[in-house]
Amino acid sequence: MIQIVCILGSSWGATRWSRKGLAIALVAILPIIGTIMMLTVPRQHKGVLLFGYYLVSCLAAITPLIYTWHVQNTAGDTKKKCTSAMVFIGMCTGNVIGPLLYSVDDAPLYRPGLISNLVMFALVAIIALLIPMYLALLNKRHAKRREELGKSAIRIDESMLKKKEMTQKGVEMEAQDQRQEQDNGFSDLTDMKNEDFIYVY
């Protein structure tokens, strides 16, 4: 139940504020806190330890955000399939390695495994905050390229817009009678080569 609430809540937040990287980083804070609790709280405080364990289980919300984020930030049929395969292989590798970090010799505290997880959660949070900066740089490069080609530098990413915003944008487009000439938005180009591609933060 906790995982379901966390998945739905983080997905709603990522859509509401159009920031998937920030959503991943915020979700990663919960298992970080939970892991620290499990490492530091004395064993006799069972309720607190259980609460820490529940916080760690919130990591399940990170997976769907990563899957949707990488798909939105990849263009080109072949590249998208290869990227999806790499992400899937990476997650499967993590699922294989994860249990091996916990040994019966480390019972009952399992400190090496918990410390490894703590480092991993911290890295996820840091990387999720750094990636949007890189994506913003790529968006600026694309905007500059559009200007060089005589196109409008400003593009609106419609993938994260709400229904009301989409309707309003449609009305504005009709009122201005704008037409996009040579728009590569639906071309089978990779995101790096397609100047009309917009990266999602």
Predicted regions and their residues:
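Helix-loop junctions at membrane interfaces in 12-TM secondary transporters
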Residues: 40-51, 62, 134-135
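A generic transmembrane-helix signature of 12-TM secondary carrier transporters
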Residues: 10, 28, 32-35, 51-53, ...
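Paired intracellular helix-loop junctions of major facilitator superfamily
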Residues: 42-43, 69-81, 107-108
